[in-house]
Structure formats: structure tokens, C-alpha cells
């Protein structure tokens, strides 16, 4: 499996919102140009919804306006170069039109979860595939991307979708959720009733499911939250530098990182509200179109946001996963502590794994791999022989193999030699081999 990928993230292009489709297309195309120049090896594009502005004010008699806006979005030549993932924004799901689903092909789209009432689409609502209505997911390399339709306010549906999708994709390193309506933003939408419903409902679920990062749009402003811990709010982790600025790197955070993307076209910007939200780590509004570059590896997920005018950095955040515990590589098990492989210091190392409640030996002769079915001489406790079974666990008590019967101390694991008193009985073991006589 490949472990490195790059994708580009764009907040609401909302073509047509400024009143000039041509101007909005120009801004959108310019941002795409800058993004692809910054990350020429990007693997795909990800739009946070509201690709167009049409909304529900246009009925079936005025679909030409809607199509002109879609043309303004899709005619950007860069969209022919890479796959494009989109979200259903509130401006995309207008009454009496199912055009969103007719313009975008979405993988693994649910016909059970994330549905909006058919009334929102009038007589054109047929199924999820034709409307683009419904939660969906895709995987790329080591990452699972789950896209929720936040025009649907059923928390139960979104929860079921997330749980079933995660269960069906157990071997990913990163879990990303994306949806249009930002629940941790700094613009005026954040206090509206639908956003409050989504925030109160989704936040604890996303934390419980171990989601790493949430990508959002809707508010045409840039905002990055602190690491959020669901119902308990911000996690207890220290999240500021000594000078009070927000951290730009966190390791093994106990919570979820939320990022809200600014407009990618410049068709509309919102003001940052006067209210100071305690969950906000970074906020920015310069009325300059933004784009974000996400770089994903096995150990780190970095999102850096840039201004499309000069490619200067607005903000960056890196989430690192420092390995702790066992990791299997090429059929061998290795033990990590704070991301550092143990047992490679020129001599072996005994470690205790609380999850299995057992002791193991890391064999320096095998680059720190777990010793299995092996007798090991350890210099601790004045020197002792210890045996590890086929699972690598230290053997304690009586043990028999093809050579004979042995006894290992129930606390230290030391092989018995000579005459030993065991449970009130005198036992004699070979001084050299430890075999019971």
C-alpha cells in the first residue's frame, strides 16, 4: 500500500454569487492555477460544496441560469487534469432541480443515510444517484474520506453511515470527514439553528469514532479549531505556544481537528463575527481567495492554506501519529514508544505490554523484532535464561517441549537450574540445560 498522497481543498466557489459568472469563473480558475503550481503532483481535488449559487430561487423555468453557473464551475480547464470530489452544499440542492447529481458522479453513495426530503427536489427527485443526495465515501491510499450531506439534519442517519463505513474499512491509517456546513466557524452561520443541531449531534460522534480531521465550507472565512473533544469541548492537551499562538503541530491528539475553508473564487466573503469563540485557534479573513494543500503520509497529515494572490501561507497544521505499541512489518512485530522503535540499541530489550499483560523480548540481532519461540539469556537479575513462546510472550511456570520439561519463575521468568523448591516439592534440574531430571 502506498502511504503518501496530496490533495487540494477548496472552499465554496459559488459561481454566480458575485453577479458575474465570468468574474467568478476567473477567480476560480486563478485559484486552481496557483494550487496546481504549488502542488503539481496532487492526486485529486476536493470542493467543500456550493459549487454554484443557484439555490432554490430558480425554478424549472430558469434552469438555463443554473447551467450557466455549472459551466462557470466546470469549464475551468484544470478540472480535466485530476479527479474531483464534491460536497452537496445548500446552494447546490435547489428546488425542482436534480442537476447536482447529473453533473457529479459520487462513489459509494448511500440510499439510506443523509437523505433530504424529496420536496427539496420536486418531481425530479428519483434516487440518490440522480440527485447526488446522500452520504458517500471513498478511500485513497491509507485514508478513508467520508462525506456527509449536511442539508440532512438526521444525526442518527449520519452516525449509522459513519459507523458502517468505518467498520467496512478497518485498515486505514487516517479517517477524514467532510461536510459543507461548518460547525466550528467564526462567521454568522455558526449560531443558526441547523448548525447548532449539527454541532451538538455530530461533534461527540466524530470524537467517539476517532475521526482525525474534519474539512468544512459554507462560511466563506478561514477558521481552524483547537483539537475538539466532543461533548467535553476542547481537549485537555496544551494547544498553545508560550507566546499564546496556536500550535502548528500536534502529536497523537485526543480529539478532532476542524478546519473551515474560505472562498476559492472570491465570489463572496463573510465577516468574522465580533463574538470570540473559545474553540477558535486561528481565524482569517482578508477577502482573498484561498486554497489548501493536504499532504498525507503514514505518520503525518498536514493541511497548509495559502492566499491565491501570492501563495503566501495563511495557516498550517500538522497532525502526527507517533507509533506506540506493536507494528508488523514484513511479517515481524516491532515495539514503538513515542514513535521510536525499541530494541535496536545494540542489545535486546525486555518490554511489558499492558494490553496483553505479558512480557516480550526485542531481539537486537533482528533489528528489534519480537523474539518468538526462543530462549534468551538476559543479564538482569544476575543473569538468567528466559523462554518466549510462539506468540513472543514470556513463559512462566512449567513448560514442556521436545527436549524435556522446564520450570520458569512465575515472576521473573528465569529458567530453573539445579535443586529448586516448587510449591513445597523439591525438584532437580540439569545445571546446564535446565531440563527436569
Predicted regions and their residues:
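Acidic, histidine-bearing metal-coordination/catalytic regions of metal-dependent phosphoesterases
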Residues: 1-17, 38, 297-322
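Active-site-proximal beta-strand elements of phosphoester/diester hydrolases
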Residues: 5-17, 142-151, 176-180, 257-263, ...
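Active-site neighborhood of phospho(di)ester-bond hydrolases with catalytic His/Asp-centered motifs
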Residues: 9-11, 44-50, 82-90, 148-149, ...
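Active-site-proximal segments of metal-dependent phosphoesterases and phosphodiesterases across multiple
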Residues: 56-67, 172-216, 224-227, 232-235
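Extracellular adhesion/carbohydrate-binding repeat motifs centered on closely spaced tryptophans
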Residues: 322-437
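Extended active-site neighborhood of metal-dependent phosphoesterases/phosphodiesterases
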Residues: 1, 59-173, 201, 227-282, ...
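Active-site environment of divalent metal-dependent phosphoester hydrolases
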Residues: 15-19, 52-56, 88-97, 154-156, ...
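N-terminal active-site segment of His-dependent metallophosphoesterases
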Residues: 1-59
Amino acid at each position: 500500500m502506498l502511504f503518501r498522497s496530496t490533495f487540494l481543498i477548496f472552499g465554496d466557489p459559488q459561481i454566480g454569487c458575485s453577479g458575474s459568472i465570468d468574474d467568478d469563473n476567473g477567480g476560480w480558475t486563478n485559484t486552481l492555477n496557483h494550487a496546481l503550481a504549488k502542488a503539481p503532483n496532487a492526486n485529486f481535488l476536493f470542493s467543500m460544496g456550493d459549487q454554484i449559487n443557484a439555490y432554490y430561487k430558480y425554478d424549472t423555468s430558469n434552469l438555463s441560469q443554473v447551467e450557466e453557473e455549472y459551466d462557470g464551475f466546470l469549464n475551468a480547464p484544470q478540472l480535466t487534469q485530476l479527479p474531483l470530489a464534491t460536497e452537496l452544499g445548500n446552494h447546490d440542492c435547489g428546488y425542482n432541480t436534480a442537476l447536482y447529481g447529473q453533473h457529479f458522479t459520487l462513489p459509494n453513495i448511500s440510499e439510506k443515510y443523509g437523505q433530504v426530503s424529496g420536496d427539496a427536489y420536486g418531481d425530479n427527485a428519483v434516487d440518490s444517484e440522480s440527485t447526488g443526495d446522500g452520504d458517500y465515501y471513498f478511500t485513497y491510499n491509507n485514508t478513508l474520506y467520508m462525506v456527509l450531506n449536511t442539508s440532512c439534519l438526521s444525526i442518527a442517519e449520519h452516525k449509522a453511515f459513519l459507523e458502517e463505513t468505518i467498520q467496512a474499512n478497518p485498515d486505514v491509517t487516517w479517517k477524514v470527514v467532510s461536510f459543507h456546513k461548518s460547525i466550528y466557524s467564526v462567521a454568522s452561520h455558526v449560531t443558526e439553528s441547523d448548525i447548532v443541531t449539527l454541532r451538538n449531534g455530530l461533534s461527540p460522534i466524530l470524537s467517539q469514532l476517532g475521526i482525525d480531521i474534519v474539512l468544512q465550507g459554507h462560511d466563506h472565512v478561514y477558521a481552524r479549531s483547537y483539537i475538539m473533544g466532543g461533548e467535553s469541548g476542547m481537549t485537555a492537551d496544551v494547544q498553545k505556544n508560550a507566546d499564546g499562538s496556536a500550535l502548528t503541530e500536534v502529536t497523537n491528539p485526543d480529539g478532532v481537528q476542524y478546519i473551515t475553508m474560505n472562498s476559492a473564487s472570491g465570489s463572496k466573503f463573510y465577516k468574522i463575527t465580533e463574538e470570540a469563540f473559545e474553540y477558535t485557534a486561528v481565524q482569517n479573513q482578508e477577502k482573498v481567495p484561498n486554497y489548501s494543500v493536504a499532504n498525507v503520509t503514514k505518520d503525518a497529515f498536514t493541511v497548509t492554506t495559502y492566499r491565491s494572490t501570492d501563495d503566501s501561507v495563511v495557516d498550517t497544521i500538522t497532525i502526527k501519529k507517533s507509533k506506540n505499541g506493536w507494528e508488523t512489518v514484513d511479517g515481524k512485530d516491532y515495539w514503538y514508544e513515542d514513535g521510536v522503535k525499541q530494541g535496536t540499541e545494540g542489545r535486546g530489550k525486555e518490554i511489558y505490554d499492558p494490553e496483553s499483560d505479558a512480557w516480550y523480548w526485542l531481539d537486537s540481532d533482528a533489528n528489534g523484532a519480537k523474539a518468538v519461540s526462543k530462549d534468551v539469556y538476559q543479564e538482569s537479575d544476575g543473569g538468567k535464561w528466559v523462554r518466549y513462546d510462539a506468540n513472543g510472550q514470556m513463559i512462566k511456570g512449567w513448560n514442556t517441549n521436545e527436549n524435556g520439561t522446564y520450570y520458569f519463575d512465575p515472576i521473573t521468568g528465569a529458567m530453573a537450574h539445579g535443586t529448586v523448591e516448587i510449591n513445597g516439592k523439591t525438584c532437580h534440574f540439569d545445571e546446564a540445560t535446565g531440563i527436569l531430571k
